[in-house]
Curated annotation (Swiss-Prot):
The gene is uppP. One of its GO terms (cellular component) is plasma membrane. It comes from Desulfotalea psychrophila (strain LSv54 / DSM 12343). Belongs to the UppP family. Its EC number is 3.6.1.27. Its main location: membrane. Keywords: Antibiotic resistance, Cell inner membrane, Cell membrane, Cell shape, Cell wall biogenesis/degradation, Hydrolase, Membrane, Peptidoglycan synthesis, Transmembrane, Transmembrane helix. This is Undecaprenyl-diphosphatase.
Length: 254
């Protein structure tokens, strides 16, 4: 993977990781279109790009990393358990699902889910407005919903946001809890890949790794801030439409 390809993947990861449009799906498609060989060294570079996205969440929500928020983080850990357990048990089977037809199909399915949900969803004052107010029951159900993200093209952010909306969270609170929930999920995935591809990091070009990391971090940091501002004025309908259109394009191109 050269520097240009790494920049492209860093931009894609930074934009799509925290939006409900599947970062994995976009990275699979981009890798195919850029003819990036799926060798162990390139997989290691993708891990570095994901780690940068984790740091972007920490940078945006650094005020949450205090002892007074320990209850919030216990709920985040609870929500992580379902996807962590199932992902660990079935990671080999899940890898076989990483195909363009599967990604395209799940893009469309996810888009339809968002359109249907937004048709019935109305913001109410009774909805949870701040992530600190989420109950353990709500956190668990959001975590269960996130399990669907193990299917490529579903979107981790999308699955967790849908679960949060169904559990009575506001759009803003749904997105913010999804951001925080990304930390253990991405850390676990990156940690697993680090263990399996550890030796490949020594073969990776440090310039390429650094450029990918910085690009992903900066884009992810800005995306999080813009996305929260967007949700204070708009709905998820545009994401539903995009998912259906992009999924149809993928299936058409084959």
């Amino acid at each position: 993977m050269d520097v240009f390809q790494t920049i492209i993947l860093g931009i894609i990861e930074g934009i799509t990781e925290f939006l409900p449009i599947s970062s994995t799906g976009h990275l699979i498609v981009a890798s195919n279109w850029l003819s990036i060989e799926q060798n162990e060294t390139n997989k290691a570079i993708e891990v570095i790009i994901q780690l940068a996205a984790i740091l972007a969440v920490i940078a945006n929500y650094r005020d949450k990393f205090t002892l007074k928020h320990k209850v919030l983080w216990s709920k985040v850990v609870l929500a992580f358990i379902p996807i962590g357990a199932i992902g660990l048990l079935f990671h080999k089977e899940i890898k076989t699902l990483f195909t363009v037809p599967m990604v395209g199909t799940m893009f469309i399915v996810g888009g339809i889910v968002f359109l249907v949900l937004e048709h019935f969803y109305q913001e109410r004052s009774s909805h949870v407005q701040e992530v600190e107010a989420i109950s353990y029951r709500q956190a668990l159900w959001i975590g269960i919903a996130q399990v669907f993200a193990l299917i490529p093209g579903t979107s981790r952010a999308g699955a967790s946001i849908v679960g949060a909306l169904l559990m009575g969270l506001s759009r803003k609170a749904s997105a913010e809890f999804s951001f925080l929930l990304a930390l253990p999920v991405l850390a676990a995935a990156a940690g697993f890949d680090l263990l399996t591809h550890y030796s490949d990091f020594s073969r990776g070009d440090m310039l390429t790794l650094s450029v990918g990391f910085i690009t992903s971090f900066l884009i992810a940091y800005l995306t999080i801030r813009v996305f929260i501002g967007f949700l204070q004025r708009f709905t998820f309908v545009s994401f539903g439409i995009y998912r259906i259109a992009f999924g149809a394009l993928l299936l058409w191109l084959g």
